[in-house]
């Protein structure tokens, strides 16, 4: 239980981000600034797949207005603004005891959303700070964005941006490296262990155990694990 934990700080994050994020600098800024809450954000245009009219039954996204000290003074919910925005990554650092207090307050009032219901109405009272992230970030909001963000990793600069820093550990399954059978053709692909390529494949990502049979032609695809 959160109440019984001994750690002083809590990190909260959504699960729809592909990002190589080191929390050390963010935590240091949080402590030095004396913030109640620190929220990571990235300067970018709002992805088309995220834009939608305000609807409390949908996932919400937020943009910020910050002052010169990095304090968040205004929080906008599901805006359709054009151009580069301070777009929240929905990654937060907060003291555990303060979070427990906020959760209790939210529960007693039937509140649901951390940003909309707890932070936005209290920006003058709370010290809420922004932490700018400058690295590679992929936001997965639907099937199309999942496909698009996977395909972007076929470019070296994007692949290096995600995996070039700290290592990212994934599920381990010992298997043979991808086998390229004589007569097969492969161009600009990423393939995991256990794949067998007998046919032709181009501009595609192959998950573990995928087999491209002889005579098959695959292009611009993401093929999932067997």
Q: Which residues does each predicted region cover?
A:
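Left-handed beta-helix
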Residues: 97, 105-226
């Amino acid at each position: 239980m959160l109440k019984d934990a001994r750690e002083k700080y809590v990190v909260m994050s959504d699960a729809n981000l592909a990002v190589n994020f080191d929390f050390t600098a963010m935590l240091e800024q949080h402590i030095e600034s004396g913030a109640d809450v620190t929220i990571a954000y990235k300067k970018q245009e709002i992805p088309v797949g995220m834009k939608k009219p305000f609807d409390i039954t949908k996932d919400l996204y937020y943009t910020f207005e910050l002052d010169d000290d990095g304090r968040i003074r205004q929080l906008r919910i599901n805006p359709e603004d054009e151009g580069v925005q301070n777009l929240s990554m929905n990654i937060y650092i907060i003291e555990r005891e303060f979070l427990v207090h906020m959760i209790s307050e939210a529960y007693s009032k039937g509140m649901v959303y951390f940003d909309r219901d707890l932070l936005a109405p209290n920006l003058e009272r709370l010290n809420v700070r922004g932490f700018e992230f400058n690295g590679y970030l992929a936001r997965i909001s639907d099937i199309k964005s999942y496909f698009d963000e996977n395909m972007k990793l076929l470019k070296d600069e994007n692949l290096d941006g995600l995996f070039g820093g700290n290592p990212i550990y994934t599920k381990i399954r010992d298997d043979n490296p991808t086998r390229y059978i004589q007569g097969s053709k492969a161009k600009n692909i990423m393939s995991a262990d256990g794949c067998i390529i007998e046919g032709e494949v181009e501009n595609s990502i192959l998950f573990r155990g995928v087999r491209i049979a002889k005579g098959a032609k695959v292009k611009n695809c993401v093929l999932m694990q067997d």
